[in-house]
Structures are given as C-alpha cells and as structure tokens.
C-alpha cells in the first residue's frame, strides 16, 4: 500500500526536531513502522524546517510536493515525514484547499530557559510572514490547520489555561493574527492543537490532541 494513501496531518509539537540527537532519530525510526506519510505543521516546541535544512544541507531537502500541492521540507533518511513551510500558506490535498498557519508562543519560555530545556526563538511567525500570508489569503478554504487558535475563541477554552500563569503577560500576537485570518477568509472546518485537549468548538472548529479525525475526500 502506498504511504501517500494514508496521510496523517499533525498540528504541531510533533517532537521530531527537538533534541537533535539519537532521541529524535529513534522517534523517527518508530514512525517508520507505520504505513503512513506525516504532514507536519510546526508548533512552538520544535525547530523550523528551514533551519534544519540550513544546518544540515547534506541530509535535508525541500521541494514542491504534488501530494500536498505545495513546498515541503524533509530529512532524506525519513522522506515520509513532510514538514510544511515556515511561513505557512496554501496547500491542496485530494482536491481540498487548505491554509496552514504554524507556530505559537511558549508560555513556559522562562521556565525552559532556566532549566536548560530547548526553546526555539523562531517559534512564532514573523511579522513579514504574517503580512504575506494575509495578503495571499484565498476567499475560502475547505480546511484551515493551525497550531494555536484565534484569540476570540479563548473564552471557549479558558478552562485549559495553566494555573499560576499570568495571562496578561502571555504574548498572544499569533492568536490575534489568527483573528485577522478568519475575518478575511471563510472555511469549511478549522483544526488546531496546542492546548492539549480534544473538543469541538463553535464555528466548525476542532481542537485536537489525542483524537484523529478522518477528513472527507
């Protein structure tokens, strides 16, 4: 069976480019045991694929994929793990139009830095990337996939916020940007991750963590 017939879309914090050592390789080897192709949208706890290519030009590649209708990055030893481009944008899978929007702010940034854990300075989209994405938005998408969610949806998920975190000090520029996105386009369904729970929201929006959803062809 062709791996491309079984495409799993991952909404960020995949864990494949985090440690940069044998732990990452072991994880990727385990993924190889499943007859799947992974299409990974970057979260906030992993390196940008363009940085992986820049640092490892002999073992990483980028090309236009007909499977997802856009630019993808991959590690040559693991071609079944495809990473969406840093700046997000348009893709097309099985004839369905898709907008991909990566990145988010790490609310535990200071804790990670104090403890010597990985933190990625490029975790959020840059202002240039945001401007270009807004400028190139289509009028409608069948699906929008992002890591975090629009700020206006937070009242539906505020019970998931961590105790002890002062929300007034959390950088929510990505969430505010996503409000602009949904004000400038329409969509059939919206899927996001980041908040470590599975639930359906209003406006045909779905938060995913453990749950997998089969998309209609």
Protein language model regions, located:
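Structural motif
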Residues: 7-11, 143-147, 191
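Core catalytic region of metal-dependent phosphoesterases/phosphodiesterases
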Residues: 1-93, 164, 174, 183
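Conserved beta-sheet core of the metallophosphoesterase superfamily
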Residues: 29, 37-41, 46-47, 56-69, ...
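Short catalytic/ligand-binding loop motif for oxyanion handling, primarily in non-cytosolic enzymes
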Residues: 17-19, 47-51, 91-93, 106-110, ...
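Active-site-proximal loop/helix segment associated with metal-binding centers of metalloenzymes
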Residues: 63-72, 94-173
């Amino acid at each position: 069976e062709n791996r491309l017939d079984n495409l799993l879309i991952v909404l960020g914090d995949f864990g494949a480019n985090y440690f940069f050592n044998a732990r990452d390789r072991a994880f990727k080897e385990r993924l190889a045991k499943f007859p799947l192709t992974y299409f990974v949208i970057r979260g906030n706890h992993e390196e940008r694929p363009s940085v992986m290519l820049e640092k490892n030009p002999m073992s990483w590649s980028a090309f236009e994929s007909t499977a997802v209708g856009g630019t993808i990055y991959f590690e040559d030893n693991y071609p079944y793990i495809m990473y969406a481009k840093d700046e997000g944008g348009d893709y097309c899978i099985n004839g369905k139009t898709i907008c991909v929007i990566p990145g988010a702010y790490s609310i535990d940034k200071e804790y990670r830095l104090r403890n010597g854990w990985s933190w990625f300075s490029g975790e959020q989209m840059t202002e240039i990337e945001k401007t270009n994405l807004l400028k190139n938005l289509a009028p409608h998408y069948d699906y929008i996939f992002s890591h975090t969610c629009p700020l206006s949806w937070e009242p539906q998920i505020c019970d998931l916020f961590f105790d002890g975190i002062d929300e007034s000090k959390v950088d929510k520029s990505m969430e505010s940007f996503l409000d602009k996105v949904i004000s400038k386009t329409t969509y059939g369904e919206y899927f996001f991750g980041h908040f470590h729970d599975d639930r359906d929201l209003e406006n045909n929006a779905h938060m995913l963590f453990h749950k997998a959803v089969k998309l209609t062809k």
